[in-house]
Amino acid sequence: MGLGWFGISSVWLLPMVWRYVARVMAGERGLKGPGTVRIWLATLAVLCASASLEALTSGRDLHGKAGGAVGRGLASLFGHMLGWTGAFLLMLGVLLWVAPMVFGHSWRQLLARLRQAGEAPPVQADARHDEADDGLKPTALGLGGAEQAMGSGHAGASRRHGIEAGSAWRQPAWQPPPRTRESPPQPGEIWPLLNAQGRPEMPLPVAAQPAPVPVPAPAATPKAATQAPSSRSALRATIVSSPFHRPQPSDGDQPPSSPEADDAPSAPVEDAAPAISPAAEPDAPASAPPEPAEPSPPTVDLEAVRQEAEALLAELRGLMTPLAAAPVASPEPEPEPEPEAETEVTPEAEAEPEAEPEAEAEPEAEAEAEAEAEAEPEAEAPAPESVAPALQEAEAATAAEAPLPAPEPAPAIEADDAAPPPPAVPAQKPRIVLPAVVGQVVSNAMPAPAPAAAPVAAAPPAPPRVVDYRLPNVALLTAASPDTVAVPAEHLEETSHLIAQRLAEFKVPVTVAGASAGPVITRFEVDPAIGVRGAQVVGLMKDLARALGVTSIRVVETIPGKTCMGLELPNARRAMIRLSEVVNAPDFQSHASHLVLAMGKDITGNPVVTDLARAPHLLVAGTTGSGKSVAVNAMILSMLYKATPEDVRLIMIDPKMLELSVYEGIPHLLAPVVTDMKQAAHALNWCVGEMEKRYRLMSALGVRNLAGYNQKIRAAQQAGHKVPNPFSLTPDAPEPLSTLPMIVVVIDELADLMMVAGKKIEELIARLAQKARAAGIHLILATQRPSVDVITGLIKANIPTRVAFQVSSKIDSRTILDQMGAETLLGQGDMLFLPPGTGYPQRVHGAFVADEEVHRVVEHWKQFGEPEYDEAILAGDPAEAAAGELFGEGGDAEADPLYDEAAAFVLNTRRASISAVQRQLRIGYNRAARLIEQMEAAGLVSPMGRNGSREVIAPGGGD
């Protein structure tokens, strides 16, 4: 990435060449004077730094052509010493540090300007400037030059075109250009004055001038009243056109000045206040004809003129005091109204001259002169073009009128220097009229100084960290115990003979065909004799269990693929099945689905896994202590071992606030673990909305499920295309679609959720169970009370995959599995698993996972960052929240003091009748109807049926 023109380029030499040409045109010594060496060194440093940057930014190819040999050499040198970044920052810092010096500025001057703009105390001048100001050189503009400046002819002045560059050692004498306006200026109009060097003068202090230092003069002449400021002074001044009388100009002109004239002594700066000429107007355009100067009487009282000018200047500076860069000790000026017309006044007066080195102050003076030229309302051309002829003419005129070279005493010494000035004579104050500019705003602030160069560019911000999710290692799980207890073959044979003998005693002849021992139970295959029905064997199971000395025997009437029955007897010693055994199994490792669940091991010891995406929902039920919560944890860990947050996101609802709260903070979560039932309803409602949104997207893309949708998005991304969102809020520029993760909703206790908001929750779960499979949203519902009021027919019909742990009755087993068998399970992880698509339950021993294992896996996932929660999941619908449809918080009926009594009556009597509540509570019909409707909104009673009756949904005290 070469910068082309940026390296060793003539662009950096233009300021120095321009300075040299301007000084030669002004008759100066072009390559000498203070500040020249600094400009030379700054130009050399800028060339080297820019060439090095050119070489460094050309793709780090230090052998290329970018930057030249010098740039490549410096880049190679500093690159080896500091590295590429260090060399780049070093060269950039050098470039920014010396760049202002190429143009004659310095960082100190720029910072001083910033402090002046902020009304900070002025920066004190260097001691060498103070010493230089104590012995100022004689002015280049003599008495004749001052008188000629007041004239209107300028006949002897030769015109030179082009803007003159000021000298850092000795400024050329300037003469103000002729008036070019068609009408004379109004009284009190402010014009900037250019000093003898060709630079605008600084405004003098606001305070009345102190007594001048007595300077012995061999010849005091009246011409001292119009003496120009010193050539070494870097101050600015303003000229006020006022109706007081001017001194009569002299007829004679002084001969041109020579270089030796700079060595003559000059008057102090304090005495230059009355030497202000009202005719110096360099900002006027040169297009209009000159205006004749105002005639002056032949004899003028110099002291009266001086005092009148001082009074007028003090009054004008009162207007400019708020604009000064720093406060100056002075008497309080008379308050004057703020001018409403725009006039750019840049007072920079100081009691002591605090000019920077003149090589640095020269560009500042030129910039301010340009700024004032732009502020002049009558200017019809850009500032440099309009000022250039006037500046050249003034220079030629004043150069011709400069005093003689110094072997002679300086004739321009003020007569007032010999004695203190008399008291000021009261005079009528002229009316100050400022030129108005239409369409511009009055600016009371100083012109903004040149902005400081930008600091060294900081290193570019690091790109966003791409999270490289790593699946947890199996070592985080506890390994299985190696000392497994195997059932000996002799024990199996002995038990087989004992089963046949006991059944023969009950006149049910059978033959034991075989036995297969597992980690928890042993299955004996029994072949009934001819004429023996299977029901006869099932009816003898309790007697057979008592005869064999076991807790329970489960009869499998039909074994798929075989003609025999199965008798499942528990082992004398149960083996613990660890989750690590199932996760390490090939069936789990080679499974392609991200939603594979490690269920456990079957009766023969083979690992059992299932795919939740094919289930597509799972219902888990079992009594307390049956291993239901451990199985849910094992299922969640199975998904955490197979899926990253980009593939699967989880929503966990834990009313007990114990089982699932340990997963708080893993990146898979879409929302914090929900423990409030109101937020649980909001989460399910959000899932329904997300399901509808995904269906619309899949329909627009022409795919049938979430896997097809993601495959189409990935194929487009690999081809370099973006699939636009067909439902974007900005159809003109739709955002591209991205892959969508699967969502698993885990509810640990459905019974509590149904009890609080049963009807609404049932509808939401039913909708998700019916349609959410293709949208990639799956449910895992767990409950410890598998009754019909919790697992309703609507939920059970849409969740074909079920897991039944030990239950207390055959009715609960039928509620879960639609068949018996769960009541005979052993507990502690012993389950009946009903796979999808089959009506045959499979006995599985669930994998055990300890709390320490869960914590280790959770900590592994937490190291990849915080989860990205969707706040809309738990926020809920504002309209629904306001109406209080779920919990009745927005209605007035629940606020009724009789609501609790009415609800208790309905739940106890199981009668949701308005008339019954009316009679029981002795209230009116309308009030009783509102109470019943509020119970319906809270999910206690069902909506009104066809015959007008309602059912009590929530369990009462009798259950």
From Swiss-Prot:
Annotated localization: Cell inner membrane
GO CC entries: plasma membrane
Compositional bias segments (type: Acidic residues): 333-379
InterPro entries given in the database record: AAA+_ATPase, FtsK/SpoIIIE/SftA, FtsK_4TM, FtsK_alpha, FtsK_dom, Ftsk_gamma, P-loop_NTPase, WH-like_DNA-bd_sf
Residue ranges constituting the FtsK domain according to the UniProt record: 605-814
Comp. bias (Low complexity): 220-229, 264-286, 380-403
Keyword Repeat in record: no
Residues on Cytoplasmic side: 104-959
Entry coiled-coil feature ranges: none
Residues the entry annotates as binding ATP: G625, S626, G627, K628, S629, V630
Bilayer topology annotation: Multi-pass membrane protein
Main localisation: membrane
Keywords: ATP-binding, Cell cycle, Cell division, Cell inner membrane, Cell membrane, Chromosome partition, DNA-binding, Membrane, Nucleotide-binding, Plasmid, Transmembrane, Transmembrane helix
Recorded superkingdom: Bacteria
Region ranges (Disordered): 122-427
Pro residues composition-biased segments: 287-298
Membrane-spanning ranges: 1-21, 39-59, 83-103
GO biological process, one term: chromosome segregation
An MF annotation (GO) of this entry: DNA binding
Function: Essential cell division protein that coordinates cell division and chromosome segregation. The N-terminus is involved in assembly of the cell-division machinery. The C-terminus functions as a DNA motor that moves dsDNA in an ATP-dependent manner towards the dif recombination site, which is located within the replication terminus region. Translocation stops specifically at Xer-dif sites, where FtsK interacts with the Xer recombinase, allowing activation of chromosome unlinking by recombination. FtsK orienting polar sequences (KOPS) guide the direction of DNA translocation.
Domain notes: Consists of an N-terminal domain, which is sufficient for the localization to the septal ring and is required for cell division, followed by a linker domain, and a C-terminal domain, which forms the translocation motor involved in chromosome segregation. The C-terminal domain can be further subdivided into alpha, beta and gamma subdomains. The alpha and beta subdomains multimerise to produce a hexameric ring, contain the nucleotide binding motif and form the DNA pump.
Name of the protein in its database record: DNA translocase FtsK 1
